[in-house]
């Protein structure tokens, strides 16, 4: 039985994207494929093992519901990996990954000595990942601290209890989190809490949706049905919450940050994927924007 109920859909798809990108030489995540296998989505594990995602001529490889999403997730992973490397070179030794899912950055990346990575997610997600990695005899590359808590709860207090120091600059990562997963009020609260816990010089990397297309919900329904046919049961209501969201770079700029934004085309181009694959489907476009910001 698939374990998506334990780890979540976005975590599962993120692992699939990293597994594909690793086989293509775009990333180096040796744990993505075994983690995905442990989740147990036959369609994904079979397609990756057969290299079907990487082949343009294959029926699966041409499916925009698969390739466009996995390309975007892989591009974002590379974007965040590079962001963290730059933060380390700048002297930041405290990292917080919000909703870390099945990513394994504390194991797979190089870190400057003295770095602590705090991974926040629901306890069952962290427990699932830890169990699989123990079975793989995975070795940490830096200090790691798992913080099992829902981001709707008081996660800053949970961070402080395990040694997080808000007086020191932090590198924050918010992947697939500011794209409608939280309700508008919840997203604003998360950004307020993050800002309050950020000393001068802290940095943030995140993705968000700059606009909400009126056709977006229709496209998402089609997206969900496509993945259900492949064995991945997605609850659309738990994934996105349509509403009036702040434009994230603008919100950050008015709350003590200096933001910069990049397009999905920029990130895909950096991976050499170019225009041959397009994010979105049908008449609506699911086109995220990628934000970095520095606390002033």
Swiss-Prot record:
Q: What is its EC number?
A: 2.1.1.-
Has keyword Transmembrane?
no
Residue positions binding S-adenosyl-L-methionine: 121, 150-151
What class does this enzyme belong to in the EC scheme? transferase
Q: From what superkingdom does this record's organism come?
A: Bacteria
Q: Name one GO molecular function term.
A: methyltransferase activity
Q: Which UniProt keywords apply?
A: Methyltransferase, S-adenosyl-L-methionine, Transferase
Among Pfam families, the record links this protein to: LCM
InterPro entries listed in its UniProt record: Ppm1/Ppm2/Tcmp, SAM-dependent_MTases_sf, SAM_mthyl_Trfase_ML2640-like
UniProt key word Ion transport? no
Q: Which residues cross the membrane?
A: none
One of this protein's GO BP terms?
methylation
Role: Exhibits S-adenosyl-L-methionine-dependent methyltransferase activity.
Q: Please state which protein family the record places this protein in.
A: Belongs to the UPF0677 family.
Q: What is this protein called?
A: Putative S-adenosyl-L-methionine-dependent methyltransferase MAV_4764
Record the organism. Answer: Mycobacterium avium (strain 104)
């Amino acid at each position: 039985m698939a374990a998506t109920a334990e780890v979540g859909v976005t975590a599962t798809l993120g692992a699939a994207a990293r597994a594909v990108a690793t086989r293509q030489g775009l990333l180096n995540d040796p744990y993505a494929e075994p983690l995905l296998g442990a989740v147990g989505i036959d369609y994904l594990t079979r397609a990756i093992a057969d290299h079907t995602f990487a082949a343009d001529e294959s029926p699966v490889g041409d499916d925009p519901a698969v390739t466009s999403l996995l390309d975007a997730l892989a591009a974002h992973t590379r974007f965040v990996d590079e962001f963290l490397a730059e933060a380390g070179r700048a002297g930041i030794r405290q990292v917080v990954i919000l909703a870390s899912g099945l990513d394994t950055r504390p194991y797979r990346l190089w870190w400057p000595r003295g770095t602590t990575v705090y991974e926040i997610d629901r306890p069952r997600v962290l427990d699932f990942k830890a169990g699989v990695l123990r079975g793989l005899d995975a070795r940490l590359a830096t200090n790691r601290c798992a913080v099992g808590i829902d981001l709707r709860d008081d996660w800053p207090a949970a961070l402080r209890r395990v040694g997080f120091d808000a007086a020191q600059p932090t590198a924050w990562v918010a992947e697939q989190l500011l794209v409608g997963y939280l309700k508008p009020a919840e997203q604003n609260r998360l950004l307020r809490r993050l800002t309050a816990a950020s000393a001068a010089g802290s940095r943030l990397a995140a993705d968000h949706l700059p606009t909400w297309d009126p056709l977006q919900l229709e496209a998402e329904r089609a997206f969900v049905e496509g993945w259900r046919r492949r064995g991945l049961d997605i609850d659309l209501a738990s994934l996105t919450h349509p509403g009036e969201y702040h434009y994230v770079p603008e919100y950050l700029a008015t709350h003590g940050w200096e933001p910069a934004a990049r397009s999905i085309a920029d990130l895909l181009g950096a991976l050499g994927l170019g225009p041959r694959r397009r994010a979105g489907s049908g008449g609506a476009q699911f086109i995220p924007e990628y934000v970095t910001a520095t606390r002033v």
